[in-house]
Amino acid sequence: MISDRPRAWNSTLPVPAKPMGRDKGLAKGKSAATRRTRPETGFSRAVKLAVRTRAGSGDPDQARCECCGIWLGRYGGQVQHIVARGMGGTSNPVLSTAANGALLAGTAQSGCHGLAESRDLGMKRTGFWLPQGTDPRMVPMVLWSGRRVYRAVDGLGPDGTGYLTGAPQEVAA
């Protein structure tokens, strides 16, 4: 049934009397909860929070892009896989840890994250992407401040910053 009152933005088209339900388009008897969704293949929420906390010097609300230093806050930017997992995923457990993540500004098509995804050589030199087969724990990353650091697997490191000053075998010695 169509009502006679015009739309709010002064259109002459009539307004439907009842809005369409959210379940339009689903097969009969199926709810939105039963639809198959794509499995989560990225970092876990805990790892994303650890990387964001590391980038915010202990406070995820103060997170900055680890490459350019722009302020991102709690919800800006994206966590980049430094060593890509590959199309079939990976069996290497290190690639799912905070040692393989960097918080970068932009999306996979823009900003620092876009540069890393496009395999920019400058991003490779600063450690924001590495070829497959590389151990991300052993290659340093150059932060926006110019500081050269290694990433801790647990996202915390010995001093709680998430960064190591030397390669893991050097720190352990």
PLM features: what roles do these ranges have?
Residues 70-73, 95-125:
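Short Cys/His-centered divalent metal-binding micro-motifs
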Residues 36, 89-90, 108:
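Residue-level detector of alpha-helix boundaries and kinks
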Residues 1-64, 69-73, 130-173:
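A boundary/linker detector
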Residues 78-84, 109-110:
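Histidine-centered catalytic micro-motifs
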